[in-house]
Design a protein with these regions (language model features):
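C-terminal catalytic domains of large/alpha subunits in multi-subunit enzymes
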Residues: 1-68, 75, 79, 120-415
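Glycine-rich NAD(P) Rossmann-fold beta1-alpha1 loop
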Residues: 107
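Conserved beta-alpha junction segments in alpha/beta enzyme cores
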Residues: 71-96, 104, 330
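Short, aliphatic-rich beta-strand segments
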Residues: 99-104, 351-353
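Short, hydrophobic/aliphatic alpha-helical segments
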Residues: 92-101, 361-364, 373
Length: 415
């Protein structure tokens, strides 16, 4: 901000001239994933009334509050998420009545992952999961093994190990920060996608095509890319809406896929593998897959009813081990405006107002996103205004510090 003042530039305008944009490389050479929208956040903040009217508001406030200084602060950060060896298991299963069961290696530590993963099923299955289980460590339906260090192994070691169809660079990531919103959701949604494509969609075609002359589907061209859920009913190109209960019952009757266990691995890009499913080969963004087929498949060679069969991958495509050397690829940006007043007599700082803008990707739960923002703001206020950690030998690293010496911000101070 001081530099912007010397250049006679709006401080946000100076940031816009230096912001990382879509397609640019980071400092280590990696190109961030997708659209990098930090510049959009800067422009939104630049147009906010707190920023636009800051000079007028300062003049008015200081005129009516003698002895107090007024100011507007702004900051924008881009934070990466992920470790370069993210992995998880997810199991999704649909009962003949249409109830969705979800099991996951992820652990709920206050991030809301138990809610987000249930909601993640809606995209493919039309309803959230209601039978939930997390922090699962035993996965007999999809036995996988690991060896070596996913960060330090050589490319030749990975190439040799991946010949084993049960091998993966890492089994399951610990829960941390907000990794559930992206990494955990990936395996959940991949499992749901497989169930939809090889279970619910064939069931829908069978129901729409029943009746004389091919039923209601015959006069139309019905493609999977036209499928969508509306008010809990599946439709496509004008077809009658079908409930999940109808589709599940039919999928079980036909012997379609009604359950899937998926394992995924991410080294700044997702591992992919080819799996034989029925008479087709599917390339999935996963390195492990097990399927459960409906009762109609009990007598077939394709599956055993009520049990899972691990599908041996034909080919696997792991990100090169050198991918970690290029740094991270997943970023999220957040900008905050803060309206402050300072008592010139005693230095007391009062936060009058604040406004934050975040680019969080596809929202799973607005309430959870809001909660994450509020928690981050409370932490930031606490660190900036109430945290005092002296340097050197008397600092908090000497082993004598606890909450008797560290000021723990109270709700009244950060709300």
């Amino acid at each position: 901000d001081d530099l912007a003042q010397q250049l006679w530039l709006d401080p946000i305008e100076l940031r816009l001239k230096n912001v990382l944009k879509t397609g640019m490389k980071n400092t280590q050479g990696a190109i961030p994933a997708g659209a990098v929208r930090a510049d959009e956040i800067l422009r939104k903040a630049q147009k906010h009334s707190l920023w636009v009217n800051r000079a007028r508001r300062k003049k008015e406030y200081e005129a009516s509050h003698p002895g107090r200084a007024y100011g507007i602060g702004f900051a924008c950060v881009q934070k990466d998420f992920g470790t370069g060896a993210e992995s998880s298991f997810a199991k999704v299963e649909i009962s003949p009545e249409g109830r969705i069961m979800l099991r996951h290696t992820g652990t709920e530590i206050g991030t809301g992952m138990s809610t987000s993963q249930a909601i993640a099923c809606v995209r493919s299955l039309g309803s959230p999961a209601t039978d939930l289980g997390f922090a699962i460590t035993d996965w007999p339906d999809l036995p996988m093994k690991t060896s070596g260090d996913p960060y330090l192994m050589s490319q030749s070691d990975q190439d040799g190990a991946q010949v084993d169809p049960q091998w993966t660079p890492a089994l399951a990531s610990p829960a941390s920060a907000s990794n559930s919103a992206f990494y955990y959701t990936h395996t959940t949604r991949e499992a749901c996608r497989v169930i939809f494509q090889y279970g619910l969609w064939p069931a829908a075609l069978a129901l729409w095509g029943s009746g004389t002359g091919g039923g209601q589907a015959a006069p139309y061209v019905v493609r999977q890319e036209d499928a969508r859920w509306e008010h809990g009913l599946l439709t496509a190109n004008g077809m009658q809406g079908l409930s999940l209960a109808q589709l599940a019952a039919k999928a079980h009757e036909m012997g379609g896929v009604v359950g899937a266990v998926v394992h995924g691995f991410n080294r700044w890009q997702w591992a992919e593998a080819e799996f034989p499913i029925g008479n087709t080969t599917a390339r999935l963004a996963a390195d492990g897959l097990a399927l459960c087929f409906g009762e109609g498949a009990a007598g077939s060679a394709a599956a055993q009813a009520k049990s899972y069969r691990a599908i041996k991958r034909a080919h696997v495509y792991y990100p090169p081990v050198q991918r970690n050397n290029a740094g991270v690829t997943y970023y999220s940006a957040m900008g905050s405006l803060a309206e402050l007043a300072i008592n010139l007599a005693n230095g007391e700082v009062e936060l009058l107002n604040h406004h934050s803008i975040i680019e969080c990707g596809n929202v799973l739960s607005e309430e959870l996103v809001s909660g994450q923002i509020q928690g981050g703001i409370a932490m930031g206020i606490g660190h900036a205004l109430y945290e005092y950690l002296p340097l050197y030998e008397d600092g908090p690293g000497n082993g004598t510090w606890n909450f008797n010496r560290y000021h723990l911000p109270r709700a009244s101070e950060v709300a």
